[in-house]
């Protein structure tokens, strides 16, 4: 597995956003004939980034050009559960795309129901794999979702309840970060979707793995960013400036717990900058 490091745009409000480095991606595809697939998530776990429509269209065109599938993890995306906070993102599929979705984020996690949108050949192959991996898969999730999808009710629930619920929590968590980290060299990836915030602490003097251990001692659980840089055997990934300076934060918990966790995180960060 190889990661293609993203381009990064910084903004005046202590936010930033990742963009696909297509020059680097196309160079890699042109020089490596062993690439079997491309994989992205939209919205992205852990950053909350949403690939732009032009980015997803260009990726699909490259997949078609090189005869490989583009796997898109759409667990938080459109049209449901619609944990997407920007207006200029649209669902996308063509025959180069294998789109994976889930009922978990719409409120049915225990059914463990995934949805694949793909060509009939790929869908059949994945169905065969699933039959081997799970001999007797449950059908409760499919049965519950079938009518909701057919009537469009699931899209309305996502738009009217799920999306605003998480967007409010995201905005509140970002406001607390600005309050507690004031004066620090902190940057928050623009929260465009999903249930996570991606915090970049540029002047942190320890790695986020070390910071994680200090936070855990205080009862605060985060996920250090090193785990999300897949393909770290590639020197380019190891040299990424964000590799050991970022944390994934889950903002979906009770407000008082999230607020106190962010306060403690800021306190420990300031002790190690």
Per-range role (PLM):
Residues 1-273:
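PLP-dependent class I/II
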């Amino acid at each position: 597995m190889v990661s293609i490091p993203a381009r990064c745009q910084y903004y005046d409000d202590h936010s930033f956003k990742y963009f696909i480095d297509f020059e680097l991606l196309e160079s890699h595809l042109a020089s490596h004939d062993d690439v079997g697939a491309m994989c992205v998530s939209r919205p992205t776990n852990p950053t909350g980034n949403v690939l732009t429509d032009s980015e997803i269209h260009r990726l699909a065109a490259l997949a078609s050009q090189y005869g490989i599938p583009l796997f898109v993890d759409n667990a938080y995306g459109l049209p449901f559960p619609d944990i997407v906070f920007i207006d200029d993102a649209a669902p996308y599929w063509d025959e180069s795309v294998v789109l994976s979705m889930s009922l978990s984020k719409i409120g049915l996690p225990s059914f463990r129901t995934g949805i694949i949108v793909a060509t009939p050949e790929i869908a059949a192959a994945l169905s065969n794999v699933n039959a081997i991996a799970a001999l007797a898969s449950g059908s409760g999730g499919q049965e519950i979702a079938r009518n909701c999808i057919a009537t469009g009710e699931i899209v309305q629930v996502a738009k009217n309840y799920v999306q605003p619920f998480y967007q409010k929590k995201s905005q509140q968590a970002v406001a607390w970060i600005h309050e507690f980290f004031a004066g620090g060299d902190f940057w928050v990836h623009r929260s465009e979707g999903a249930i996570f915030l991606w915090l970049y602490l540029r002047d942190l003097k320890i790695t986020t793995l070390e910071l994680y251990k200090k936070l855990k001692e205080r009862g605060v659980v985060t996920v250090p960013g090193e785990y999300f840089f897949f393909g770290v055997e590639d020197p380019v990934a190891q040299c990424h400036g964000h590799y050991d300076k970022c944390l994934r934060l889950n903002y979906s918990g009770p407000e008082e717990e999230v607020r106190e966790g962010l306060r403690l995180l800021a306190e420990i960060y300031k002790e190690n900058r």
